[in-house]
Amino acid sequence: MLPPSVTLRPQPLLTDTDLLLYNLIRLAVEDHYLVFARVPLWSVVSVEGDGKVRLQVLRQIALKQLDFVLVHPGTKVAEQVVLLEDGFPPQPHEVSRRQDIQSVLQAAGITLTILKPQTSYTVLQLAQLLGVSEDE
C-alpha cells in the first residue's frame, strides 16, 4: 500500500495552546455539549442537492478543518463551532478559509465563535462566549 520510501509516524493532534483551550472549553460547556477537536467540516453538515452541484460543494469543503465542535449529546448534531484565529491581522488564506467555513455553517444553522489562542480566557468567559453561562 505504501511505497517503501515512505515512513508514517503518529503526530500530536493538538498543540499545547490548543489543548489548554480544549480543556477550558470542555469545562465551560460540560453540562451542555460534547467537545470534539480537529473535525472535518464535511462531517458536521449534510450536503444535499443534485449530483454536480453537490460534488462541487463537497470538494469546496473537503479539506477544511474545524478547531473545536460542540455537539448536543441528545441529538448528536453539531450546534456550535469554535475556530482559532492565530494571526493579527489574519493572513489572506486564513480570511478566505474562515469566510468559506462561516458561509457553510451559517447555511446549516450552526453557530460560529472565533477565539484568539493568545488571549487568556477563564471558564466563565468561555461559558458566556459560547452562550451556556447560568446568567443567560
Regions found by a protein language model. Give the residues of each.
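N-terminal topogenic membrane-targeting module
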Residues: 1-49
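Non-catalytic C-terminal interaction segments of nucleic acid-processing enzymes
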Residues: 1-10, 120-136
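Generic signal for short, ordered secondary-structure residues
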Residues: 3-4, 47-48, 54, 83-84, ...
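Generic anion/oxyanion-binding catalytic loop in active/binding sites
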Residues: 10, 57, 115
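Active-site metal-binding core of divalent-cation-utilizing nuclease and nuclease-like domains
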Residues: 13, 37-77
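Intrinsically disordered, low-complexity Ser/Thr/Pro/Gly-rich regulatory segments
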Residues: 16-19, 23-33, 37, 95-106, ...
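Short, mixed-charge, low-aromatic patches
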Residues: 22-26, 55-62, 80-86
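Basic, amphipathic alpha-helical patches used to engage nucleic acids or provide basic targeting signals
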Residues: 69, 73-128
